[in-house]
Amino acid sequence: MDYWFAEIVTIGNEVLSGKTVNTNASHIGRRLTSLGFTVRRITVVMDDIDEIVSGFREAIDRKPKVIVSSGGLGPTWDDKTAEGLAKALGVNLELNKTAFDMILEKYTKRNIPLTEERKKMAYLPYGAMAVENNEGIAPGIYIYHNNIDILATPGVPREMENVLENFINKMLRNKPNLKYLEDFIYVENVMESALAPYVKELVKKYDIYIKTHPKSYELLRPILEIQIAGSGREEEIKVKIEKVKNELLDAIKKLNGIIRNSL
């Protein structure tokens, strides 16, 4: 398969402590996958400047095509993503006029004064661009560095989703000429362990992703959801998935499995 790697960095103590479920990473992962990227790693770091710098630097060193972060762009003392990204890139923070104008307009419309804490959200790494946030205040941060698209989004889910879409539609440079496709088989009466040798052989033969998801207890009434997925040229990946599906169906038949239309 062709791979256009992507990485996700989540910033927030609340995620590490378990207080907040990392739904942002799930959404970003699904969205990038739908574009043809292969998400290789999700990194979660605390609200600590050194940890944020390390998270970005390590991701950059692995040279993916795109890095998307969420969290840490707000006005409070523990919102440190802009500073961490700047240090990771070896540049200074600067007052970005576009970001400043975006923020000023939103507060002015509500007759709210622009305090230093609110102005903080307009400081971006040197060379970065502000990404419109139509659902909140803090703009996203976009910078193209060493052939990597880097985007920092707010942590509030609806704001993250909006900034991510604005980035994809207007700024993303590295767009894979690939299509992500997947298909599913639902089967009863076949244990995951019994199907495992067939899956292993097909993965090796076709260089494709096959994942069995057990939906019940294996030793009682086994039910499996089988996912077949891959990225590549659309027609090629369609043909490959169809071949894999047919061979899996043959294996399921040998194992006396019962095919279902859905779970």
UniProtKB/Swiss-Prot annotation:
Pfam family, one: MoCF_biosynth
Entry-linked SMART domains: MoCF_biosynth
Family matches, as PANTHER family: NICOTINAMIDE-NUCLEOTIDE AMIDOHYDROLASE PNCC (PTHR13939), NMN AMIDOHYDROLASE-LIKE PROTEIN YFAY (PTHR13939:SF0)
Family (UniProt): Belongs to the CinA family.
Name listed for the protein in its UniProt record: Protein M1627_2099
Source species: Saccharolobus islandicus (strain M.16.27)
